[in-house]
Amino acid sequence: MANKFRTLDDVDVKGKRVLLRVDLNVPMENGRVTDATRLERVAPTITELADKGGKVILLAHFGRPKGRDAKESLKPVTEALSKVLNKPVAFADDCIGEPAATAVAALKDGDILCLENTRFHKEEEKNDPAFVAELAKLGDIWVNDAFSAAHRAHASTEGLGHKLPAYAGRTMQAELDALEKALGSPTKPVIAIIGGAKVSTKIDLLENLVSKVDALVIGGGMANTFLHAQGVGIGKSLAEKDLAPTALRIIEKAEAANCAIILPVDATVAYHFAANAPSHAYGLDAIPADGMILDVGPQSVARVHAAIDDAATLVWNGPLGAFEMQPFDRGTVAAAKHAAERTKAKKLISIAGGGDTVAALNQAHVAGDFTYVSTAGGAFLEWMEGKPLPGVEVLRIK
């Protein structure tokens, strides 16, 4: 995979103005960054470019502003980034025009500058050619290190790749290498664990995966829709009953592709959707009519463990139960710990992505033991759905 993209190994950046697209979309409260994970992810690329004598010019969006909005300024994020890098980071209060040009002109080799939120200009999301040209004036090369925004064809995430020599940053490179290991040319057998509440948001994903993986574990609220489609009484559980025909179609498609579908065989049921609500495990033939399935049961967990043991590669998106409330995190935490153990024993390549998935792995204290954890939400999902990502396609060596 790496040889299909130009990386930082292919360019001498000394003295060059490097427009570096990064993901600085971090959570903030009262003007302070509350989680610096994304800043830590981009630090290696920024540091490498600066250490090699490049003039590093950061492009990023923040939030979804409608025009200029002080609450969506990147200035406080720049201050947090400076702490993570342990280097000064200059700031320009616009990403184009005179403020940007003046700040860029002042840079010496190895300096770092962050330009203001690209989304303060509506032309960013329209990928407007005149806006792209304004941005391109500020740089000699463009490096895309924001895989999490690669599913959007915006000016700073895609348009610049047509105007300037384009390269993948180290975060982007790591993500593309991991995804290639996951589904591009994986070590077989491959298992996917797909959870979360709704089938409706993951139809494309499931339909793509059944032709790519050897086994597909379906958990979370999604599994209730599949169980209902197969005639299992699910009580008052969350389900999209109108999608029963879709669920059956996916099962048929899996059978035709020789992909084993692994659904729960028992369930943890409670009568209230609340933390520490009294709960009990039931077989599928005995789910109480007024109960709610909130997690997979112990027999299902054992089946998931066995499926992981049979696999060489695991791709995971979505929790197996209502993991944000104890004790309904048990199934997800147990499976995550099991996958982490197999990974540490060098028996499994494990790749996980999506917001809830990352939160669940952190809750199980195993995120660091997985082969790769993607912080990209939408881009990770669209890639798993088999869709081309504009911000990646533009990096391919033509």
UniProtKB/Swiss-Prot annotation:
Residues reported in the UniProt entry to bind substrate: D23, L24, N25, R38, H61, F62, G63, R64, R119, R152
Kinase among keywords: yes
Residues the record lists as binding ATP: K202, E324, G354, G355, D356, T357
Organism domain of life: Bacteria
Subcellular location: Cytoplasm
SUPFAM superfamilies: Phosphoglycerate kinase
Catalytic function, reaction form: (2R)-3-phosphoglycerate + ATP = (2R)-3-phospho-glyceroyl phosphate + ADP
GO cellular component: cytosol
UniProtKB keywords: ATP-binding, Cytoplasm, Glycolysis, Kinase, Nucleotide-binding, Transferase
EC number, as in UniProt: 2.7.2.3
Biological-process GO terms, alphabetical: gluconeogenesis; glycolytic process
Chief site of localization: cytoplasm
A GO MF label: ATP binding
Pathway of action: Carbohydrate degradation; glycolysis; pyruvate from D-glyceraldehyde 3-phosphate: step 2/5
PANTHER family: PHOSPHOGLYCERATE KINASE (PTHR11406), PHOSPHOGLYCERATE KINASE 1, CHLOROPLASTIC-RELATED (PTHR11406:SF23)
Subunit structure: Monomer.
Protein family per UniProt: Belongs to the phosphoglycerate kinase family.
Protein name per the record: Phosphoglycerate kinase
Gene source species: Bradyrhizobium diazoefficiens (strain JCM 10833 / BCRC 13528 / IAM 13628 / NBRC 14792 / USDA 110)
